[in-house]
Regions:
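Flexible coil/turn and secondary-structure edge motifs
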Residues: 1-148
Length: 148
């Protein structure tokens, strides 16, 4: 579920978050079953499919709302993420991913939900999202529920 979290503005809109003064990050809320996929696997996919080393930027998208972050819900997630980040830091560029507790998640507006499937031919989807999805399918096919 796409949404916003990590900031101080209550019930933010996309416009609020885009201005950069809400403190929120554009996020995806992931609900998972540890029996089906491990938190370690989720961390592996997360760090492999975006740039965790550049502050306030993902590709051509620039702004505080694009910063890399893990908003954990239990201490075990925090500890696992800290260890994962430590290993990444020791083997490459410094990771700038924020790590903090999730306080409140605000669901994004309806037009952001299933955005890619509804707009797959749009230039942004073709240039930015499609290559990331192909990388995800190629590298992590065994973890994907519906890989076709």
């Amino acid at each position: 579920m796409p949404g916003y979290a990590g900031g101080q503005t209550k019930n933010p809109t996309y416009e609020d978050v885009s201005r950069g003064d809400s403190g929120h990050i554009e996020v995806i809320k992931i609900e998972y079953s540890p029996e089906q996929i491990s938190y370690e696997d989720l961390l592996t996919v997360f760090f492999a499919t975006h740039d965790p080393t550049t502050p306030d930027r993902q590709g051509a998208d620039v702004g505080t709302q694009y910063r890399s972050a893990i908003l954990y819900t239990i201490d075990e997630q925090k500890l696992a993420a800290e260890a994962f980040i430590k290993n990444l830091d020791e083997s490459g560029p410094r990771v700038v991913t924020e790590l903090k507790p999730l306080k409140t998640f605000y669901a994004a507006e309806e037009y952001h939900r299933n955005y890619y499937s509804r707009n797959a031919s749009a230039p942004y989807c073709q240039i930015v999202i499609s290559p990331k999805l192909e990388k995800l399918k190629t590298r992590f096919n065994e973890l994907l529920k519906n890989s076709e």
